[in-house]
Protein backbone atom coordinates (compact mmCIF):
# COMPACT_ATOMS: atom_id res chain seq x y z
CA UNK A 1 0.00 0.00 0.00
CA UNK A 2 2.85 2.39 0.89
CA UNK A 3 4.45 1.81 -2.50
CA UNK A 4 1.16 2.49 -4.22
CA UNK A 5 0.80 5.80 -2.40
CA UNK A 6 4.23 7.20 -3.29
CA UNK A 7 3.48 8.03 -6.94
CA UNK A 8 0.30 9.86 -5.98
CA UNK A 9 2.29 11.85 -3.41
CA UNK A 10 4.59 13.07 -6.16
CA UNK A 11 1.66 13.79 -8.47
CA UNK A 12 -0.13 15.72 -5.72
CA UNK A 13 2.92 17.79 -4.83
CA UNK A 14 3.55 18.56 -8.52
CA UNK A 15 -0.08 19.57 -8.99
CA UNK A 16 0.05 21.82 -5.91
CA UNK A 17 3.25 23.50 -7.09
CA UNK A 18 1.85 23.93 -10.60
CA UNK A 19 -1.18 25.79 -9.27
CA UNK A 20 0.67 28.01 -6.80
CA UNK A 21 3.81 28.55 -8.88
CA UNK A 22 2.56 28.68 -12.50
CA UNK A 23 6.06 28.64 -14.02
CA UNK A 24 6.98 25.36 -12.33
CA UNK A 25 5.94 22.42 -14.47
CA UNK A 26 2.62 24.02 -15.28
CA UNK A 27 0.62 25.35 -18.19
CA UNK A 28 0.40 29.02 -17.25
CA UNK A 29 -1.21 31.17 -14.62
CA UNK A 30 -4.43 30.34 -12.90
CA UNK A 31 -7.13 32.93 -12.31
CA UNK A 32 -9.98 32.64 -9.86
CA UNK A 33 -13.02 32.39 -12.09
CA UNK A 34 -15.33 31.61 -9.22
CA UNK A 35 -16.87 34.69 -7.59
CA UNK A 36 -15.77 35.31 -4.03
CA UNK A 37 -19.36 35.13 -2.84
CA UNK A 38 -19.93 34.77 0.88
CA UNK A 39 -16.70 35.31 2.79
CA UNK A 40 -17.71 33.33 5.85
CA UNK A 41 -15.84 31.38 8.44
CA UNK A 42 -15.39 27.74 7.48
CA UNK A 43 -14.20 26.74 10.94
CA UNK A 44 -16.59 26.77 13.86
CA UNK A 45 -16.00 28.94 16.94
CA UNK A 46 -15.16 25.75 18.81
CA UNK A 47 -12.00 25.41 16.69
CA UNK A 48 -10.97 29.05 16.35
CA UNK A 49 -11.73 29.79 20.03
CA UNK A 50 -11.26 33.51 19.49
CA UNK A 51 -13.65 34.50 22.28
CA UNK A 52 -11.86 32.31 24.83
CA UNK A 53 -8.53 33.75 23.68
CA UNK A 54 -9.76 37.32 24.12
CA UNK A 55 -11.19 36.55 27.56
CA UNK A 56 -7.86 35.10 28.64
CA UNK A 57 -6.07 38.19 27.29
CA UNK A 58 -8.14 40.37 29.60
CA UNK A 59 -7.51 38.09 32.58
CA UNK A 60 -3.73 37.98 32.03
CA UNK A 61 -3.52 41.76 31.54
CA UNK A 62 -5.44 42.33 34.79
CA UNK A 63 -3.20 39.99 36.78
CA UNK A 64 0.05 41.37 35.37
CA UNK A 65 2.44 42.80 37.95
CA UNK A 66 3.50 46.12 36.49
CA UNK A 67 2.56 47.58 33.12
CA UNK A 68 2.57 46.02 29.66
CA UNK A 69 5.29 48.45 28.61
CA UNK A 70 7.52 47.21 31.41
CA UNK A 71 6.89 43.60 30.41
CA UNK A 72 7.74 44.29 26.78
CA UNK A 73 10.87 46.22 27.81
CA UNK A 74 12.07 43.36 30.02
CA UNK A 75 11.67 40.86 27.17
CA UNK A 76 13.54 43.13 24.77
CA UNK A 77 16.40 43.30 27.28
CA UNK A 78 16.39 39.50 27.55
CA UNK A 79 16.73 39.23 23.78
CA UNK A 80 19.58 41.75 23.74
CA UNK A 81 21.42 40.01 26.59
CA UNK A 82 20.82 36.50 25.16
CA UNK A 83 19.01 35.39 28.29
CA UNK A 84 16.80 32.28 28.39
CA UNK A 85 13.15 32.82 27.38
CA UNK A 86 10.75 30.89 29.61
CA UNK A 87 7.59 29.19 28.39
CA UNK A 88 5.37 31.22 30.68
CA UNK A 89 6.92 34.45 29.44
CA UNK A 90 6.07 33.64 25.82
CA UNK A 91 2.52 32.59 26.74
CA UNK A 92 1.99 35.87 28.60
CA UNK A 93 3.52 37.90 25.77
CA UNK A 94 1.19 36.39 23.17
CA UNK A 95 -1.77 37.34 25.36
CA UNK A 96 -0.56 40.93 25.82
CA UNK A 97 0.00 41.81 22.15
CA UNK A 98 -2.38 44.44 20.79
CA UNK A 99 -0.63 45.84 17.71
CA UNK A 100 1.61 44.96 14.77
CA UNK A 101 4.65 46.27 16.68
CA UNK A 102 3.83 44.00 19.61
CA UNK A 103 3.57 41.03 17.23
CA UNK A 104 6.98 41.88 15.75
CA UNK A 105 8.43 41.58 19.24
CA UNK A 106 6.54 38.31 19.73
CA UNK A 107 8.03 36.96 16.49
CA UNK A 108 11.56 37.71 17.70
CA UNK A 109 10.83 35.99 21.01
CA UNK A 110 9.38 32.99 19.17
CA UNK A 111 12.55 32.61 17.09
CA UNK A 112 14.69 32.71 20.24
CA UNK A 113 12.42 30.35 22.20
CA UNK A 114 12.29 27.81 19.37
CA UNK A 115 16.07 27.90 18.88
CA UNK A 116 16.49 27.13 22.58
CA UNK A 117 13.80 24.42 22.77
CA UNK A 118 13.45 22.80 19.33
CA UNK A 119 15.07 19.58 20.57
CA UNK A 120 12.57 19.26 23.42
CA UNK A 121 9.25 19.43 21.60
CA UNK A 122 7.78 16.10 22.78
CA UNK A 123 4.83 16.92 25.03
CA UNK A 124 5.71 20.60 24.83
CA UNK A 125 3.10 23.38 24.95
CA UNK A 126 1.57 24.12 21.53
CA UNK A 127 2.19 27.80 20.83
CA UNK A 128 1.03 27.59 17.21
CA UNK A 129 -2.75 27.90 17.76
CA UNK A 130 -2.15 30.71 20.26
CA UNK A 131 -0.12 32.74 17.76
CA UNK A 132 -2.69 32.07 15.02
CA UNK A 133 -5.53 33.32 17.21
CA UNK A 134 -3.52 36.47 17.88
CA UNK A 135 -3.01 37.02 14.14
CA UNK A 136 -6.69 36.23 13.58
CA UNK A 137 -7.70 38.92 16.07
CA UNK A 138 -5.33 41.56 14.65
CA UNK A 139 -5.80 40.69 10.94
CA UNK A 140 -2.13 39.84 10.53
CA UNK A 141 -2.38 36.79 8.31
CA UNK A 142 0.78 37.83 6.42
CA UNK A 143 2.82 37.50 9.62
CA UNK A 144 1.30 34.09 10.24
CA UNK A 145 2.13 32.88 6.71
CA UNK A 146 5.69 34.20 7.04
CA UNK A 147 6.35 32.21 10.21
CA UNK A 148 4.64 29.01 9.07
CA UNK A 149 6.82 28.90 5.94
CA UNK A 150 10.08 29.81 7.70
CA UNK A 151 12.38 26.77 7.73
CA UNK A 152 14.03 28.00 10.95
CA UNK A 153 10.73 27.43 12.77
CA UNK A 154 10.18 23.85 11.58
CA UNK A 155 8.41 22.01 14.38
CA UNK A 156 7.01 25.12 16.07
CA UNK A 157 3.75 24.81 14.12
CA UNK A 158 3.49 21.04 14.38
CA UNK A 159 -0.28 20.80 14.87
CA UNK A 160 -3.13 20.83 12.36
CA UNK A 161 -5.07 23.50 14.28
CA UNK A 162 -2.43 26.16 13.51
CA UNK A 163 -2.58 25.49 9.77
CA UNK A 164 -6.37 25.18 9.76
CA UNK A 165 -6.88 28.53 11.50
CA UNK A 166 -4.46 30.21 9.10
CA UNK A 167 -6.14 28.74 6.01
CA UNK A 168 -9.49 29.87 7.40
CA UNK A 169 -8.12 33.42 7.83
CA UNK A 170 -6.91 33.48 4.24
CA UNK A 171 -10.13 31.93 2.90
CA UNK A 172 -12.28 34.58 4.56
CA UNK A 173 -10.22 37.33 2.90
CA UNK A 174 -10.38 35.69 -0.52
CA UNK A 175 -6.64 34.89 -0.54
CA UNK A 176 -7.14 31.41 -1.95
CA UNK A 177 -3.73 31.09 -3.57
CA UNK A 178 -1.98 31.93 -0.30
CA UNK A 179 -4.24 29.46 1.47
CA UNK A 180 -3.13 26.79 -0.98
CA UNK A 181 0.51 27.64 -0.25
CA UNK A 182 -0.21 27.01 3.43
CA UNK A 183 -1.79 23.67 2.52
CA UNK A 184 1.39 22.77 0.61
CA UNK A 185 3.50 23.73 3.61
CA UNK A 186 1.30 21.64 5.88
CA UNK A 187 1.84 18.62 3.63
CA UNK A 188 5.59 19.29 3.33
CA UNK A 189 5.88 19.38 7.13
CA UNK A 190 3.97 16.07 7.40
CA UNK A 191 1.29 17.58 9.61
CA UNK A 192 -1.71 15.25 9.77
CA UNK A 193 -4.80 16.33 7.83
CA UNK A 194 -7.95 16.47 9.93
CA UNK A 195 -11.62 16.61 8.96
CA UNK A 196 -11.41 20.42 9.04
CA UNK A 197 -8.30 20.35 6.84
CA UNK A 198 -10.14 18.50 4.08
CA UNK A 199 -13.06 20.94 4.29
CA UNK A 200 -10.66 23.87 3.94
CA UNK A 201 -8.60 22.21 1.19
CA UNK A 202 -11.64 21.37 -0.94
CA UNK A 203 -13.18 24.80 -0.31
CA UNK A 204 -9.97 26.48 -1.46
CA UNK A 205 -9.87 24.33 -4.60
CA UNK A 206 -13.56 25.10 -5.23
CA UNK A 207 -12.90 28.84 -5.00
CA UNK A 208 -9.89 28.65 -7.33
CA UNK A 209 -12.12 26.73 -9.78
CA UNK A 210 -9.51 25.66 -12.30
CA UNK A 211 -8.51 22.36 -13.95
CA UNK A 212 -5.43 22.33 -11.70
CA UNK A 213 -7.40 22.85 -8.48
CA UNK A 214 -9.86 20.16 -9.60
CA UNK A 215 -6.91 17.79 -10.07
CA UNK A 216 -5.62 18.58 -6.57
CA UNK A 217 -9.06 18.08 -5.04
CA UNK A 218 -9.45 14.74 -6.84
CA UNK A 219 -6.04 13.43 -5.74
CA UNK A 220 -6.59 14.52 -2.13
CA UNK A 221 -9.97 12.78 -2.09
CA UNK A 222 -8.61 9.58 -3.60
CA UNK A 223 -5.67 9.49 -1.17
CA UNK A 224 -8.03 9.99 1.77
CA UNK A 225 -10.14 7.04 0.64
CA UNK A 226 -7.02 4.87 0.20
CA UNK A 227 -6.09 5.64 3.79
CA UNK A 228 -9.56 4.62 4.93
CA UNK A 229 -10.51 8.14 5.94
CA UNK A 230 -14.15 9.19 5.68
CA UNK A 231 -14.61 12.65 4.20
CA UNK A 232 -17.20 14.84 5.85
CA UNK A 233 -20.36 15.87 4.05
CA UNK A 234 -19.14 19.49 3.93
CA UNK A 235 -15.86 18.53 2.27
CA UNK A 236 -17.65 16.31 -0.24
CA UNK A 237 -20.09 19.10 -1.12
CA UNK A 238 -17.21 21.41 -2.06
CA UNK A 239 -15.71 18.62 -4.18
CA UNK A 240 -19.05 18.04 -5.94
CA UNK A 241 -19.51 21.77 -6.59
CA UNK A 242 -16.01 22.06 -8.05
CA UNK A 243 -16.56 19.05 -10.30
CA UNK A 244 -19.81 20.58 -11.57
CA UNK A 245 -18.11 23.93 -12.20
CA UNK A 246 -15.51 22.07 -14.25
CA UNK A 247 -18.26 20.19 -16.15
CA UNK A 248 -17.02 16.88 -14.71
CA UNK A 249 -20.55 15.62 -14.15
CA UNK A 250 -19.67 11.93 -13.87
CA UNK A 251 -17.12 12.72 -11.16
CA UNK A 252 -19.63 14.92 -9.36
CA UNK A 253 -22.18 12.10 -9.39
CA UNK A 254 -19.59 9.63 -8.12
CA UNK A 255 -18.61 11.85 -5.18
CA UNK A 256 -22.25 12.68 -4.41
CA UNK A 257 -23.16 8.97 -4.31
CA UNK A 258 -20.65 8.47 -1.47
CA UNK A 259 -22.15 11.15 0.78
CA UNK A 260 -23.88 9.70 3.79
CA UNK A 261 -27.22 11.36 4.58
CA UNK A 262 -27.31 13.78 1.61
CA UNK A 263 -30.15 15.75 3.16
CA UNK A 264 -28.47 19.08 3.91
CA UNK A 265 -29.51 22.18 2.00
CA UNK A 266 -26.18 22.08 0.13
CA UNK A 267 -26.70 18.45 -0.92
CA UNK A 268 -30.29 19.08 -2.00
CA UNK A 269 -29.26 21.95 -4.27
CA UNK A 270 -26.19 20.18 -5.65
CA UNK A 271 -28.41 17.24 -6.55
CA UNK A 272 -30.58 19.61 -8.60
CA UNK A 273 -27.51 20.96 -10.44
CA UNK A 274 -26.40 17.39 -11.16
CA UNK A 275 -29.82 16.68 -12.72
CA UNK A 276 -29.57 19.87 -14.79
CA UNK A 277 -26.11 19.15 -16.15
CA UNK A 278 -27.01 15.49 -16.78
CA UNK A 279 -30.13 16.53 -18.75
CA UNK A 280 -32.31 14.36 -16.51
CA UNK A 281 -35.17 16.82 -16.83
CA UNK A 282 -38.12 14.57 -16.02
CA UNK A 283 -36.42 13.23 -12.89
CA UNK A 284 -35.51 16.82 -12.03
CA UNK A 285 -39.14 17.96 -12.11
CA UNK A 286 -40.19 14.82 -10.23
CA UNK A 287 -37.65 15.56 -7.48
CA UNK A 288 -38.89 19.13 -7.10
CA UNK A 289 -42.51 17.99 -7.17
CA UNK A 290 -41.90 15.44 -4.39
CA UNK A 291 -40.26 18.13 -2.28
CA UNK A 292 -43.15 20.55 -2.84
CA UNK A 293 -46.06 18.16 -2.36
CA UNK A 294 -44.72 15.86 0.33
CA UNK A 295 -47.33 15.29 3.04
CA UNK A 296 -44.99 16.23 5.85
CA UNK A 297 -45.79 17.34 9.36
CA UNK A 298 -44.95 20.94 10.13
CA UNK A 299 -42.37 19.55 12.56
CA UNK A 300 -40.51 17.71 9.78
CA UNK A 301 -37.75 19.65 8.07
CA UNK A 302 -38.54 20.34 4.40
CA UNK A 303 -35.99 20.66 1.62
CA UNK A 304 -35.01 24.26 0.87
CA UNK A 305 -33.91 25.39 -2.58
CA UNK A 306 -31.76 28.33 -3.62
CA UNK A 307 -33.49 30.90 -5.83
CA UNK A 308 -30.33 30.87 -7.94
CA UNK A 309 -30.60 27.10 -8.49
CA UNK A 310 -34.31 27.28 -9.31
CA UNK A 311 -33.52 29.96 -11.92
CA UNK A 312 -31.14 27.48 -13.56
CA UNK A 313 -33.92 24.88 -13.61
CA UNK A 314 -36.30 27.25 -15.35
CA UNK A 315 -33.64 28.17 -17.91
CA UNK A 316 -33.07 24.47 -18.60
CA UNK A 317 -36.74 23.53 -19.12
CA UNK A 318 -37.91 26.73 -20.83
CA UNK A 319 -38.04 25.09 -24.28
CA UNK A 320 -40.20 22.18 -23.08
CA UNK A 321 -43.75 23.60 -22.63
CA UNK A 322 -45.08 20.72 -20.50
CA UNK A 323 -42.11 20.84 -18.14
CA UNK A 324 -41.98 24.62 -17.82
CA UNK A 325 -45.68 24.72 -16.94
CA UNK A 326 -45.19 22.07 -14.26
CA UNK A 327 -42.10 23.84 -12.95
CA UNK A 328 -43.97 27.16 -12.60
CA UNK A 329 -46.64 25.36 -10.59
CA UNK A 330 -44.03 23.72 -8.33
CA UNK A 331 -42.13 27.00 -8.00
CA UNK A 332 -45.25 28.71 -6.66
CA UNK A 333 -45.85 25.94 -4.11
CA UNK A 334 -42.24 26.06 -2.91
CA UNK A 335 -42.57 29.78 -2.25
CA UNK A 336 -45.87 29.35 -0.40
CA UNK A 337 -44.39 26.62 1.83
CA UNK A 338 -41.28 28.68 2.57
CA UNK A 339 -38.91 26.30 0.79
CA UNK A 340 -37.00 28.93 -1.20
CA UNK A 341 -33.99 30.89 0.04
CA UNK A 342 -32.35 33.93 -1.52
CA UNK A 343 -28.93 32.58 -0.51
CA UNK A 344 -26.78 31.61 -3.48
CA UNK A 345 -25.37 28.10 -3.73
CA UNK A 346 -21.96 29.57 -2.88
CA UNK A 347 -23.36 31.10 0.31
CA UNK A 348 -25.00 27.80 1.22
CA UNK A 349 -21.73 25.91 0.72
CA UNK A 350 -19.69 28.41 2.75
CA UNK A 351 -22.17 28.64 5.61
CA UNK A 352 -20.66 27.52 8.91
CA UNK A 353 -22.70 25.02 10.93
CA UNK A 354 -23.28 25.59 14.63
CA UNK A 355 -20.92 23.98 17.11
CA UNK A 356 -22.11 20.55 18.16
CA UNK A 357 -19.91 20.57 21.25
CA UNK A 358 -21.51 23.76 22.55
CA UNK A 359 -24.90 22.02 22.45
CA UNK A 360 -23.42 19.01 24.25
CA UNK A 361 -22.05 21.29 26.96
CA UNK A 362 -25.54 22.68 27.53
CA UNK A 363 -26.92 19.15 27.75
CA UNK A 364 -24.19 18.08 30.14
CA UNK A 365 -24.92 21.05 32.38
CA UNK A 366 -28.45 19.73 32.83
CA UNK A 367 -27.29 16.25 33.79
CA UNK A 368 -27.44 17.45 37.40
CA UNK A 369 -30.50 18.59 39.32
CA UNK A 370 -30.43 22.29 40.16
CA UNK A 371 -32.33 21.57 43.38
CA UNK A 372 -30.41 18.58 44.79
CA UNK A 373 -27.09 18.85 42.88
CA UNK A 374 -27.44 15.10 42.24
CA UNK A 375 -27.35 13.46 38.79
CA UNK A 376 -30.77 13.96 37.19
CA UNK A 377 -31.39 10.21 36.93
CA UNK A 378 -30.93 9.77 40.71
CA UNK A 379 -32.93 12.89 41.47
CA UNK A 380 -35.87 11.74 39.36
CA UNK A 381 -35.83 8.28 40.95
CA UNK A 382 -35.83 9.83 44.42
CA UNK A 383 -38.84 11.94 43.51
UniProtKB/Swiss-Prot annotation:
The protein's matches in PROSITE patterns, at most eight in alphabetical order, are given as: PPR
Where it sits in the cell: the answer is: Mitochondrion
Task: Enumerate the Gene Ontology biological process terms.
Answer: mitochondrion organization; mRNA processing; regulation of mRNA processing
Instruction: List the InterPro entries hit by this protein, alphabetically.
Output: mS27/PTCD2, Pentatricopeptide_rpt, PTCD2, TPR-like_helical_dom_sf
PPR repeat ranges per the UniProt record: 161-195
UniProt modified residues of type Phosphoserine? 377
Q: Which controlled-vocabulary keywords does the entry list?
A: Mitochondrion, mRNA processing, Phosphoprotein
A Pfam family annotated for this chain is MRP-S27
- Please give the GO cellular component terms listed in this UniProt entry: mitochondrion
The molecular function terms of the Gene Ontology recorded here are: RNA binding
Which family does the entry's similarity section mention? Belongs to the PTCD2 family.
Report the protein's function: Involved in mitochondrial RNA maturation and mitochondrial respiratory chain function.
The record's annotation in NCBIfam families points to: PPR
Q: What is this protein called?
A: Pentatricopeptide repeat-containing protein 2, mitochondrial
Amino acid sequence: MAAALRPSNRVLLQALQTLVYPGVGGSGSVSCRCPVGAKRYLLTDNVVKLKEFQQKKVAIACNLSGTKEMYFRNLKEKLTQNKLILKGELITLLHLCESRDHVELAKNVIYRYHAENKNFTLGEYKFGPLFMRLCYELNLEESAVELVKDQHLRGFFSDSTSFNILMDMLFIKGKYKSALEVLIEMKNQNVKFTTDTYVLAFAICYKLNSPESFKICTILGEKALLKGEILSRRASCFAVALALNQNEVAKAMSIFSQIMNPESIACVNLNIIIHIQSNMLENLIKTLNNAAEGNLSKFVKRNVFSEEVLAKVREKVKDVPALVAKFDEIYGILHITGQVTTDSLDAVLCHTPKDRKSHMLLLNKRMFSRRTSQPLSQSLLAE
